[in-house]
Amino acid sequence: MLGPGTGAYGYLSGYLDGSGKLVKLVPLEIDRDTTTPVEVLDGEITIDALPVPHGIVPALGFRVTVGDASIVFASDQNGSSDDFTDFASDASVLVMHLPVPEEATGTALQLHARPGRVASIAAEAGAGTLVLSHFMARSLRDLDANVDVVRKGYDGAIVIASDLACIVVTD
């Protein structure tokens, strides 16, 4: 994929060896079938990753922890994993995608969670603030109605993500 000259993203090949003034990335393999978080970074900031269900397309959720505060990025997922709900437990901020409406069917549900499921994950996890992101045309058609579904199932603060928005994270 990143091979110089032949890869679909060949222009990014410098990330593999640090050439072209790009930061060298060190790939970390995470088994898509693991049900326990994998530590990606440890130090003043800790980052853990967990595979999340997104049809046949691999996806990872991330938990970033600084002191007592944490932000969990749900990533693209269909919301069917109790392991993820545990992973997101007591997050200061939970960022979840809202790309499909409540009435979505078929393939969309293999990839994405309905608004009601987004709400139940946030509520069960005890998230402090829920940030809704990754809107698609089908969820934007009636964004207010989709957010209302989330509000019915989640009592905490809800933020509609927008580019360059700043969200205060407290512990």
Enumerate the predicted regions with their spans:
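Binuclear metal-dependent hydrolase catalytic cores
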Residues: M1-I71, A145-D171
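Cap/insert and terminal regions of metallo-dependent hydrolase folds
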Residues: G61, S70, Q77-C166
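Fold-independent oxyanion-binding glycine-rich loops
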Residues: I30, L50, S75-Q77, H97-L98
